[in-house]
Amino acid sequence: MDIKEFKENWGLTEIPTELEKLIYFQTNISSYENYSDGFGVLIDEKWGLKSWSEDDLFLEKLFPFAQANGSGSFYCIWNDGTSKPMNNMPIVVFGDEGGVHIVAENILQLLHLLTFDTEITVDFDEIFFYKDEDDYEESEDLDEFLKWLKDDYNLDKIEDTSTIISSAQDKYKENFEKWFKQYY
């Protein structure tokens, strides 16, 4: 994936360093969906978002950047209007079957969730990561992903995803839902 093309798609000259490094990792060390089950950074022209609302005020606050699972859910950075740097903005998941939820407080927390190495399940009322140990197959490049996260961000493999999700929802869910209801 070309980082310049990714930035141009968002109409920005800069993107979060964590995202730029992730794109480099996916392009040069691993590949799409090979380091965390169902996940891959992609260039998205907001077609998925437009199925929720075509209002420019809605679209300009959301930055889709990755596939969340193999069935069409996707992750976005949400500009919540607080003037914080983009790498500290909350992450939202839009479900392919419906359901829109805050999933992480920022991009780094999402990267930590990805170390669980299973697709996110997005229902109307909740989101969760579930791993059936009897059926689990580790992603081909998970070890490289874990090494990269440890070296760059001192993050280890996560065993419980609910703490990150709950913390993010406690912090942002109410404001996000209030904002989102204006458009959907």
Give the residues covered by each predicted segment.
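A surface-exposed partner-binding patch
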Residues: 1-84, 146, 155-184
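Conserved aromatic-histidine-acidic binding/catalytic patches
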Residues: 53, 57, 95-102, 133, ...
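Glycine-rich, flexible loop segments associated with nucleotide phosphate handling
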Residues: 59-60, 87-89, 138-145
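Compact, glycine/acidic-enriched structural inserts
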Residues: 87-128
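Mixed-charge (acidic/basic) macromolecular-recognition segments
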Residues: 112-177
